[in-house]
Amino acid sequence: MTDIDARLREDVHLLGELLGNTIRDQYGEAFLDKIEQIRKGAKADRRGSPGAELSASLDQLSEDELLPVARAFNQFLNLANIAEQYQLIHRRDESQPAPFEARVLPELLARLRAEGHSADALARQLGRLEIELVLTAHPTEVARRTLIQKYDAIAGQLAAQDHRDLTSAERGQIQERLQRLIAEAWHTEEIRRTRPTPVDEAKWGFAVIEHSLWQAIPNYLRKADKALFEATGLHLPLESAPIRFASWMGGDRDGNPNVTAAVTREVLLLARWMAADLYLRDIDHLAAELSMQQASPALLARAGDSAEPYRALLKQLRERLRATRNWAHAALSAAVPAGAEVLHNNRDLLEPLQLCYQSLHECGMGVIADGPLLDCLRRAVTFGLFLVRLDVRQDSSRHTSAMTEITDYLGLGRYEDWSEEDRITFLMRELSSRRPLLPGYFKPSADTAEVLATCREIAGAPAASLGSYVISMAGAASDVLAVQLLLKESGVLRPMRVVPLFETLADLDNAGPVMEKLLHMPGYRSRLQGPQEVMIGYSDSAKDAGTTAAAWAQYRAQERLVDICREQQVELLLFHGRGGTVGRGGGPAHAAILSQPPGSVAGRFRTTEQGEMIRFKFGLPDIAEQNLNLYLAAVLEATLLPPPPPQPAWRHLMDELASDGVRAYREVVRDNPQFVEYFRQSTPEQELGRLPLGSRPAKRRAGGIESLRAIPWIFGWTQTRLMLPAWLGWEAALSKALARGEGDLLGQMREQWPFFRTRIDMLEMVLAKADADIARSYDERLVEAELLPLGEHLRDLLSQACAVVLGLTGQSQLLAHSPDTLEFIRLRNTYLDPLHLLQAELLARSRKQQAPQGSPVEQALLVSVAGIAAGLRNTG
């Protein structure tokens, strides 16, 4: 297809027209004409006409016009996103094939059967998959929950107007509702005035479950069950939940002093309240539906003397759910003991639902059992009483400081000064000791008290409400043992997964030896229940070394971990800390999973889902269903049909690419003394720290570029369209390989090795979104004269990267093989270009005026950030 679907253009045109009506109503025809002039100027500029007219139009805007112009283009981009999302899930003619997301699992199951996999083995493997998607807050998630709900309602009206049998009056009513919703969105502030709290972020995550995933989970499982039955004649077991959810919102305290033990407790209680409330809605619906009299002896024994036994049993469950909800609500305000009626165990939720289900089937009413009751059962298996499992994350340095304070107090010396072997000896001895390490009168510092308070919250919370304890910047076996000891001292007597997160290039290279040392310790092995979980960091390794070297280090670390766990006869669970952007390990999940090393996805897969990508991937039930299908199919395929290990020649060339890539990356980022100052002048990085975008500070406590968090590092370059972290290093690595005459080998790797093909595909995607002209416009407006040559050099490197990828793929244009995607990017550019130029102007004015927070310039700047993030479909 060379042009975007005409119906998508119709929707974009309609939504734009309705937005125009709203803007005209508030600001008049002349202002709307000015917006249209800017839009047409951007379009002409893209077609090669002189861009001076567009720049002049923006330069002439008065201070009062800056904010409404920025808001107009921001809203255009959000409406275009809605139309595009709708296009992805609807409007398929019967003559067209089903979308890939709907076909992927049935086609995979058919292929597996054809290749000799037995029906029993397939059904068993699909039912046993353990996929956990970990929802994380995002310091740059810019869309307010209020607006997201209005955007979802707009998508609903697009679906309503698609019915073919509408009368003209009904069609008119839909357009009126669309007009009203767009007006509501326009007259709602798109940017929050204050930073969200960690609890606000957790509520945002719960809202995604309430409004989308609650519906999507039973829908995708119903279709997976149908696909399995068609391929094997077998059904998914009732207790099967291949995909579950965890969360970092309210548990991730790494670099965020706002996440305290009290916050973690509050979020755990809120999750219990929300879960009980959602089940109560389901039970009310089921009680109205299940009016039947005939029931199995087992159900009748539980229901007592009732003419409507199903309703009687559900009434008992409803009373317990109400008690649970009321207790959780009261416990948010004060410590309240839980009464006997409060539900604490998932079995108590599941058992009455399963009893109803089995009874209906036994009494010949399977068609009723397999309706909303089955949906409720599958939600209960997936979400349980706690909705999501909350992870706790903290930096290893905080644990080292706490241990140092403790050993210092006890007169044992300073833990932080000890060798690794001395630390391990001490920690293993204390872990096996029956006496407490800490005396009751120990008075820790505020930081250590907070670490211990968090561990006590873990001790007091139900095990099923918690996920893993993740240690950021882990680099040694003692990092894991120290957390185990702190948990033990705080009363955590049950096993809890303590997960090292290996982030930098050096730590990734050291991940194998660290885990090998741990797994050789008998005391450690005896405490390990279930799989050994290890987290692979994508963001910091890419910031440290560039994506070329980081991607290869991540791959090799996983290979080594697979080998070590196989040798030690321990099951491995790899946890992937991916971001939304290519520079942070993001990209299409299906391709990414299939590109993992063989053996690394053995029926288990855990990954983070980042703030703004949660909205795009799971914000609407139909979109969520598509993405759940992709995860399910990809993990099943990677488990049963893993890729072959890379050939020695590929490994050798990848070593060369990584070495050349990291050298080229660090020459720019670390060795050029002008680089940090150029970054700060040419991007909105400094301004981002002042904007109320998330609960976590954008920088760690002190330091230069190393202290900058990976997210704003990516965000700054994304806003200016240079996209530097995602490609820098590849241009040198690939060019040198071609110069050595290794082009044929690169082509073979791209053709036959999923890992390399996926890396090149993601590189091509980000290069297609990059724009040297836009990046230059920021330099011209913001950068001091002596730094301009560096900007020109970086844009030259971008051109080299584009040229070498085109040479490798044999195309004349990036994404020529994906015209739909290319057209989506072009459609957005018409609205993005004015926002970029306007943002550069706003940055210049803000820096010159030292604009205070809340000023029109600052507000317009924040809106431009939000609009560009929406237009590019990712932030950091």
From Swiss-Prot:
Keywords: Carbon dioxide fixation, Lyase, Magnesium. The active site is at residues 138, 543. GO terms for cellular component: cytosol. It comes from the Bacteria. It catalyses: oxaloacetate + phosphate = phosphoenolpyruvate + hydrogencarbonate. Its EC number is 4.1.1.31. One of its GO terms (biological process) is tricarboxylic acid cycle. It is an enzyme of class 4 (lyase). Its cofactor is Mg(2+). One of its GO terms (molecular function) is magnesium ion binding. InterPro entries: PEP_COase, PEP_COase_bac/pln-type, PEP_COase_Lys_AS, PEPCASE_His_AS, Pyrv/PenolPyrv_kinase-like_dom. Belongs to the PEPCase type 1 family. PANTHER family: PHOSPHOENOLPYRUVATE CARBOXYLASE. HAMAP family: PEPcase_type1. Forms oxaloacetate, a four-carbon dicarboxylic acid source for the tricarboxylic acid cycle. This is Phosphoenolpyruvate carboxylase. The lineage of its organism: Bacteria, Pseudomonadati, Pseudomonadota, Gammaproteobacteria, Pseudomonadales.
